[in-house]
Amino acid sequence: MKYTLTRIDPDAPVERYPQEQRQTVEDPLAQEASRGIMIGRLEEVLQDTVNWGRKNSLWPYNFGISCCYVEMCTAFTSPHDVARFGAEVIRASPRQADFMVIAGTPFIKMAPVIQRLYEQLLEPKWVISMGACANSGGMYDIYSVVQGVDKFLPVDVYIPGCPPRPEAFLQALMLLQDSIGKERRPLSWVVGDQGIYRPQMPAEKDRKRGERINVTNLRTPDEI
């Protein structure tokens, strides 16, 4: 599997945020593990164990901007049982949360606030962009709206829709869990930039393209 190595680039231009340098690499543990090297196998087991704990205990930060936040809150009601994913513990402070959901329209005045809250999240941290407005500005192609939160934040999962259904939010959690399960992070006591390896997951539209092309009987709106 291809991985994206992300490192902090302090010499990057100030107007670029986050100040990261990315490059595509191979799995850093696959080569050592395939050769049967003891240290490589041990590190692979440790990585899988730590990732298992992280992906099954995702604490979201309670933050919403606009109408998509209503659908996000609906996903936390009893019919959807978000506790299955270990994400029912909503945090009131970003310092106690694992990931942040940008649910709503990111206005330019709100962008510095979102960026500040993201910086207060402790590593490891992830971002989900929920809804058309957060993904690309939606129908608000105007001066006061940022055309996508990925202009100033690194986004891990995009949820399409206006607004997305609660089931779409649950699917995004599962996709984020799959991505976290394949991550490679430093297991070290050294404080500082050591690089993060994130898997290059295939887009859902590409993965389901063949299945959707083969659909011949379209359901009516009342059957969906």
Swiss-Prot record:
Look at the named UniProt entry and state the broad enzyme category this protein falls under: translocase
The molecular function GO annotations come to:
4 iron, 4 sulfur cluster binding; iron ion binding; NADH dehydrogenase (ubiquinone) activity; NADH:ubiquinone reductase (non-electrogenic) activity; quinone binding
Q: Keyword set for this entry?
A: 4Fe-4S, Cell inner membrane, Cell membrane, Iron, Iron-sulfur, Membrane, Metal-binding, NAD, Quinone, Translocase, Transport, Ubiquinone
> Which positions bind [4Fe-4S] cluster?
C67, C68, C133, C162
What is any one of the record's Gene Ontology cellular component terms? plasma membrane
SUPFAM superfamilies on file: HydA/Nqo6-like (SSF56770)
Kindly list the places in or outside the cell where this protein is found, as annotated in its UniProt entry: Cell inner membrane
* Record region (Disordered): 202-224
- Assign the protein's first listed, main location to one coarse class: membrane
Could you tell me which Pfam families the record lists for this protein? Oxidored_q6
Quote the cofactor binding remark: Binds 1 [4Fe-4S] cluster.
Bias regions of kind Basic and acidic residues — which residues? 203-212
Q: What is its EC number?
A: 7.1.1.-
Record protein name field? NADH-quinone oxidoreductase subunit B
Naturally occurring in which organism (per UniProt): Aeromonas hydrophila subsp. hydrophila (strain ATCC 7966 / DSM 30187 / BCRC 13018 / CCUG 14551 / JCM 1027 / KCTC 2358 / NCIMB 9240 / NCTC 8049)
Gene name linked to the record: nuoB
